[in-house]
Amino acid sequence: MKLTLVQIFFMMLLLLLGLGVGLGVGLQMAAAVLEESDQLLDEFLSSDSQDKAEATKEGLASRSTETLLVSNKEVVQPEDTIISEDEVGGDRMLRAEVLLHSNKDYLRSDVMDRECNALMALKVKSKDHTCIPQYIFIHEELDAVKAVCKSPAVACDLKGGKCHKSPRPFDLTFCKLSKSGQVIPHCNYVTFILEKYILMSCSDMKVQITS
């Protein structure tokens, strides 16, 4: 059977039409797959953004918890509270101690290192097992504290004794018992971080905070 040119041309046309239809269907399927991929990508990005937002909220909540923990330990910054002279010893002579640290330790500004419950735990308590009501820690170089004793003597609340005033405000941690009548080992202190002038009795190392 011989094919004429017209028949061959008609068969070629049918073949091309078949290829065109197949290619069109293939393109439609590819477009559908791409559209579905875009939707999945959008959903993933949206979920990732939501997870980051939730993580940020959790981080803020954790930071707030840390702040509350510091507050529960009763660490009080001087700029956050108004402290009267009575609260920081008034005209009383209080026992004091110069904390000897290396230069690196002295320059550290971590408030928790100056929390009174930790500092006072190392102190010798009263013989009758009552907690020491008030105590002062001086965060200055020992030479600076010794130099106070070379200044002119001034009047202070110490019978028969002499006191000397610091030439500048000293960095102090004042520890005050939160409630009177507490006994060992249940001593709970409030922490005051101050910069104040001091009157010091060099004979027995007692300090009075002054302005």
UniProtKB/Swiss-Prot annotation:
GO biological process, one term: single fertilization
GO function terms (MF aspect): nucleic acid binding
Keyword rRNA-binding: no
Signal peptide: 1-24
Subcellular location: Secreted
Keywords, in A-Z order: Cell adhesion, Fertilization, Glycoprotein, Secreted, Signal
Post-translational modification: The N-terminus is blocked. Glycosylated.
GO CC terms, sorted: extracellular region
Coiled coil location: none
InterPro entries assigned to the protein according to its UniProt record, in alphabetical order: RNaseA, RNaseA-like_dom_sf, RNaseA_domain
Alphabetical list of PANTHER family matching this protein: INACTIVE RIBONUCLEASE-LIKE PROTEIN 10, RIBONUCLEASE
Known function: Secreted proximal epididymal protein required for post-testicular sperm maturation and male fertility. May be involved in sperm adhesion to the egg zona pellucida. Does not have ribonuclease activity.
Family: Belongs to the pancreatic ribonuclease family.
Protein name: Inactive ribonuclease-like protein 10
Organism, as annotated: Bos taurus
The encoding gene: RNASE10
